[in-house]
């Protein structure tokens, strides 16, 4: 049996209990990660089936294209759009960075053709649900 197969029942149970604990959680895809909006600046909390707690903020590439083109047909490359997206994200990320890193989160940047996101993630142990709930509450407190 693979690790994924053995962890799926634990995830299914954890997912169900977390949705009871925090009814605002929603699935990003059926049976997959749970997500929760954090505050008004666009932060998102995500809990993944493989045991990661992620706080992230991102921008859709089409949104940044619209901001930069201001109605002109100028076509910017993906790299330039990604640089500009990170520039727009920096003020909000800078406010949260110290607290998240101090709490054991690792910072990363994810980029695709569709979006750019700054993520802060740390592992959580589904066997200790109280600790997972505490971590969720702490994250909510940082952004509300």
Where are these regions (language model features)?
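Short, internal acidic amphipathic alpha-helical interface segments
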Residues: 60-119
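A short, solvent-exposed beta-edge/loop patch
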Residues: 103-129, 133-142
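Well-ordered, non-membrane alpha-helical segments in soluble/globular domains
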Residues: 86-96, 132-143
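Short, surface-exposed, charge-dense and proline/glycine-enriched linear segments
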Residues: 53-66, 137-144
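Residue-level detector of solvent-exposed, low-hydrophobicity positions
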Residues: 18, 32, 50, 95-96, ...
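Charge-rich, low-complexity N-terminal segments
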Residues: 1-59, 87, 97, 101-104, ...
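Residues that cap or initiate secondary-structure elements
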Residues: 42, 61-65, 124-126
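Negatively charged, low-complexity tracts enriched in Asp/Glu with abundant Ser/Thr
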Residues: 2-31, 68-80, 129-142
């Amino acid at each position: 049996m693979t690790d994924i197969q053995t962890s799926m029942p634990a995830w299914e149970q954890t997912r169900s209990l977390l949705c009871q604990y925090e009814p605002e959680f929603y699935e990003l895809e059926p049976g997959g990660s749970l997500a929760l909006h954090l505050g008004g600046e666009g932060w998102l909390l995500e809990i993944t089936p493989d045991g990661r707690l992620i706080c992230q903020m991102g921008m859709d590439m089409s949104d940044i294209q619209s901001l930069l083109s201001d109605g002109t047909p100028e076509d910017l490359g993906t790299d330039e759009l990604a640089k500009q997206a990170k520039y727009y994200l920096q003020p909000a990320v800078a406010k949260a960075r110290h607290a998240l890193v101090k709490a054991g989160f690792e910072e990363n940047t994810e980029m695709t053709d569709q979006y750019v996101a700054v993520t802060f993630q740390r592992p959580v142990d589904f066997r200790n649900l109280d600790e997972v709930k505490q971590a969720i509450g702490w994250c909510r407190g940082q952004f509300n």
